[in-house]
Amino acid sequence: MARSFVDRELFGLALAALAIAACAKDPGYKNAGTGGGQLGGLGGTGGGGGGQPADSCADPQPWSEPAAPAACADTAPAASGAVGATIAVDAGAAVGAWNRFYEKAVAVDHAHTLICTNYGRNAANALRKAHAQAGFQYARFHGIFNEDIGVYREDASGVPIYDWSRLDAVYDAVVAAGMRPFVEVSFTPNALASDPSQVQKLLWYNQISPNISPPTGAADDWGKWGALMTAFVQHIEERYGADEVRASWYFEVWNEPSWMYGPGDGGYWELYKNTVTGLLQGDPGLRVGGPAGSAGETPSMIRMLITGALNSGTKLDFVTYHRYGDDNGLPVADVKDAVAFHASVQDIVNTTVAKNMKFTGEVINNEFGPSWMPDISRDNEVAASYIAKMIHLLGTDPTVPAPAAYGYWAVSDLYEEIYTGTASAYRPGNYGLMLKGDPKIPESFDVAKPSFNAFRLLHMLGDQQLGVTGGTAGDGVGAAATRSSDGSAVQVLVYNHVDGGAADSSAAITVSLTLNNLPFTGPIRVRQYIVDRGHANSYRAWLAMGQPPRPTQAQWVTLRDAAELCYYETTATPAGGTWTATFPQSIYGVALFEIRAAN
C-alpha cells in the first residue's frame, strides 16, 4: 500500500466496518484464523512443525505444470492505415545482459494466505504457477508474526512460548513452489505489543487486524522481541539449512513504518536496530534491510536508515520502498512518475546520503502496480502495457541503476487485505495477477489476468539485450529486444502504453518493425504473442458473458481459455539478414515476436 497514511487509514477503517457487518452473511467466508495445530511447550521449545495445520485448505488436485502456449485459432490482426511508429533492431550485436530484476520477487498478501483464506482456497498453487510461467524467485508477504500464524505467546508467568507449526507451513509452501522467502519481519505479537489497541484496520485478515505498535511496553520487551528474532533464525536455519538461509534469504524489518512513526520520528530506527540485533545473534551473516516505505515516507525513512546504519555500524544490506502508478494523486498506471521516483531514490542512496560514506547495498521496490487500491486497471489490459513499459524503462536507462528487484503486488486475488465480505467468485478490480476462482470448480483456479500474461512475455525474453531505435516519444509505442545466449532465437517485445489508463484500448497504431543482421541463414519462423483487449484477456471475456459474479463451470472454462497465451506463426526468408513486418499495436497492448531458424 502506498498513498498517504491518512487516506489509507480512513479508507481502511471504512472497509473494516463494512467487512465486519457483511462477514456473518457471507457464505464464502471461512475464518482461517482460529484453527491450527496445538501450541508448543514452554520456553520456546514447542511447535516443531511437520504436516499441514488444521486450518489448511489446499486445492483438491495435485499441482501440474501448465501447458505451453498453442497456436491461435484465428488469424493474426492485419495492419491498416499509415505507419505511426517504426522500430529497428540490430540483432547482430548484444549491448549488454538483459536484466531480469522484475522476476526477483512477487507478493502474496499476508502469510496465512499460503495456508488458507476466507474463500476456502490458499495461494500456494498460484505461487507455483507464477514461478513456472513467469520465473518469479522470491515471495514476500505481511504478517509472519501475526496472531493467525500463532508463533508467540506467553504463559501466566510471562515465559515465552514459541509455536512454529504454521510458520513452517507458510515457508514450506514457498519452497515447494521453487521459490525463496523475502522475509518481511512483521507485525508485533499481541503478547509483546506496547499498545494492544493499536491495530492496522486496513490490514483486516479474517477479522484479525495485526498489531503495529512496537514491542516497548515493558522494560524487557525489546529483550523478548530480540530473543524471538534469534529463535526464529535458529529454527528456520535448522529446517531449511543455515547456508541456504544465510546466503539467499532476505530479512526486511517491517512494512511502511508511517503506520507507527512520523517522518522525523526515530522510532523506526529503534525498531530496526533492535530487530537486526536479534536476527544477527541467530546468524551474523544474514542479509538485512528496510524500511519498505510508502511513497510519501520513503525519502526521509531511507535517509534516516542509511545514516543511522553507517554512523553506528549497524548492518544494512539493502533498502526497500513502495511505489504505485497512482501515488501522489496521479491517475492510474502512470509509468513516467514511478521511473522518476526510482531515480530520486537512487540519488538519495548514492549521493545525498552517501557523500563521504558510500552505501553500496541493493535498492529494491517490493510493491508496485498500476494502482495502490483496487482498480479495474488491475484486471484489464492497462496493467499489461503498464508492466511492460515500466520494466523496459527501468531496465534500460543508462543514467540510473536498475532496481535489484521490482516486485508486483500481488500474485493472486486470494487476497484479504481489503476484504469487504463479498463472496463473488469474480470480484473485478482486485490486486492479483490471477483470479481467485471458485473453490468448487477446479477449472477456475488461478486463471491469468492480462497482467500475468505480460510477465509471461517478459519471461520469454532472452539473456542478451540488443540495440533498439524508434518508437514514439513519451506515451505510445516502445520496444525492447533480446537474443538467447545460445543464439537460437531473437525476441522483440513491443508495447503501446498511455499513462493514466483512460485512452481507448480499441484503437491501434500501425507499427513497422525491422530486424537487421539476423544470425540465421535461410528461412525463419516467426511467432507473435499478443496481450491486449482482444487477446489473452480474461476480463474482456467476463464482460462479454454478462459479468456474472459467480460464473458456472462452463463459463470458467471459457474464461480460462480466453486468458491463455497463443501465438500466430509465419515463415519468411530474410533478404540480406533483414526482416520487416507491419502490424497493429493496440493501445494498452503488448506483443512479443520470437524469431528462430525455420528448420
Which positions does each model-derived feature cover?
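Ser/Thr-rich, Pro/Gly/Ala-heavy low-complexity intrinsically disordered linkers and tails
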Residues: 2-5, 16-80
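Surface-exposed intrinsically disordered loops and tails
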Residues: 57-75, 116-122, 153-161, 194-220, ...
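Glycoside hydrolase catalytic-domain groove-lining segments
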Residues: 126, 326-376, 401-409
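Substrate-binding cleft and catalytic face of glycoside hydrolase catalytic domains
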Residues: 134-336, 347, 351
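Aromatic/acidic polysaccharide-binding cleft in carbohydrate-active enzymes
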Residues: 367-500, 504-506
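Carbohydrate-binding surface patches
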Residues: 474-542, 588-594
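C-terminal beta-strand-rich structural cap/linker in extracellular carbohydrate-active enzymes
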Residues: 550-599
